[in-house]
Amino acid sequence: LRQISAKPISLPEMADRFTRHNAGITFCTICLACIVFVGLRGRVGTRPLQRVDSGISTHRILNLGTLNPIYNLRAAWAEFRFLSDFFSSSRLIPDESLKEHARVLVSALNPATNTVPVVPASMSNASVVDFSWPAWQRTAAGSPTRVPKHVFILFMESYDSWPFLEKYRELGLVEEGRKLSDEGLRLMSYLPGDNSSLFSSLVCLQGIFETNRARQQSIPTSLANAFNRLGYVTRNINGFSAEWSSCERIAREQGFKEVYCTAQIKPGGDTANFQVHDRTLFNFASEKLTYDQPTFNFIRSSSYHGPFEVDLKAEKCEISGIPEHLRMKGMRDENELRQAYGTLKYSDRMLGEFVRKMITRHPDSLFIITGDHYGRHFITTTPDSYEGSSVPLIMYGPSVLEGISFPEGTAGSHVDLATTLIELCAPKGFEYASLGKNLFKPFPDSFGVGRDFVIFPDAVVCLRGKPDCISLPWQKDASLNDQQREDLIRRARELHDAYHAIGYMMTRRSLENALR
């Protein structure tokens, strides 16, 4: 050490000596490349640092600051491109087409009249897509039963309809949902608003299709808007981080007064991607929040979203295997199915425990249970149009739902949920805007519109690629002839295109006015 200290070497001299050798140059280059590579990815691991990983604190600006500039620049560019596309002139819908879409919707939403509503030729494009247009206005009739003090929408990850069908019952995947629906109400001719969690939640909460995920608003058709006006404390409770699809920002823009994500529920989460298990989520909602005032609670689960990290053995939710008679051609890997179905069983059990606990504490509560979209883990890779699209609508609340039921021949989707809940909770004379139906009101020729699918009381139509129409599974003796299929496909296309076109233009005009 004394010899080394007696002959000090400057840093430039050391670097010069080191770089005289090819091995040193190579080593330095590799180290520098690794540092740059890891820096750009943001972490050491199989997956680069993503926006979902940044929701680790309760402060959004601090969260975004954890991401590297390259990633933030790319994210900003993607959002800019999305907004540019949303407001592109090429997406504008011609006046005549818009008027025809409006005529289809007005006619569909007012079937009790014997005359088809006429859209005046002089009507401007702007009036049809204004939230204040008379055809979109509703006046609540007053709740037919006891008004709920607390409303809970359990927006369950991939909680679809097919496990409720009798032929799959022995799998035992949704026994809690089945029991609650047997004691309450269940609608199986029902569709999600979209085929992804984010966009489906936007339809459910905003009561309209095609809203802009990058710029949300508290619009007149929305659930948050209505329940704020009705005096409820509006809560948005999520089993994932605040930056997952910007869920915290979106909820606040929609008008929710309270927003809870992983950072508030359990900092760090339960999984590798900062999700919290459904047990943690529902325990937070039941034990950490107060209910001394009327509340509207939108709860989004995440356990049935990969990666599946629930300890199924500890939760006693393991699936032994797929019964022989349910095995079919094109069946997926059984080990993967068992893992997925065990997680679904766990998620279903957690929602059941939560509902039972809360209804005991707050008997004047209403619970709405539905899936965000159809699942991704069918037994076969080619499910039919019903099993590959539908989610159930379950409503539970003995004191609130006493004496009411879904009329025979009812079909619906997430876009109808706002209207249905407002009519259950609002006093007579309450005014609101809506493009949906009240599912408790008899409705001739009922229907439900989603993304690429339209459901009717006895059939479902898939509009992807070559359109297809099949009878619903419980319509055992019903067979559709070619003419009936053609008529339903044509009707489905009209309704689907009208809902999405009107929704897009209403949202676009509203945002354009807000940004001026």
Model-identified regions with their sequence ranges:
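Solvent-exposed soluble domains appended to multi-pass membrane proteins
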Residues: 114-516
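N-terminal secretory/membrane-targeting segments
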Residues: 1-149, 166, 170, 174, ...
